[in-house]
């Protein structure tokens, strides 16, 4: 039953009624099938990227090139940040560059983690497993931010001194509110992003 007491048809419905405070306008330039991912994965990446200042003069790393990561790369690059991808292998390097990354760092190759030490202002991890938090923290500059949007199944441990000594920040982020969702829709339309 719906709020009005009438039966609902779920996914078979021809229309819905919602409160206007929870409606976003999808710009005409975004086809509806392209808008759907922006409303979940797009806002999930846009929120920490804008909150932590991705933009011109900033060096940003997106960890993982899956559904979330490929959106993060496009959004970060469109914000004007020097955007990098951290991935296990080079298999997605062409996509990373096509989406706006200047470099892909393959962690399966020797010396990759060491070469990234202290390189990034902001690192956004989309991974749910397979990387140690200490490795991510080591990649950001003093006062840099590691924003985690992936949800690991197991406990994450790290050495607190790796955060404290350089005043680094570890933050979590999960989607965004209605105003921020409208903002990412408008941003994607303005930058012609086809997420």
Q: Where in the sequence are the language-model features?
A:
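Adenosine-nucleotide cofactor-binding segment
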Residues: 56-65, 77-135
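Acidic carboxylate diad motif detector
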Residues: 149-150
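Helix-to-beta-strand junctions that scaffold the AdoMet/dcAdoMet cofactor pocket
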Residues: 140-142
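Glycine-centered, small-residue-biased loops immediately flanking beta-strands
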Residues: 144-145, 168
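Glycine-rich helix-loop-beta junction characteristic of Rossmann-like nucleotide cofactor-binding loops
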Residues: 49-55, 138
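Glycine-rich phosphate/adenylate-binding loop and adjacent beta-alpha elements
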Residues: 1-23
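C-terminal substrate-binding/catalytic core of Rossmann-like NAD(P)-dependent dehydrogenases/reductases
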Residues: 153-195
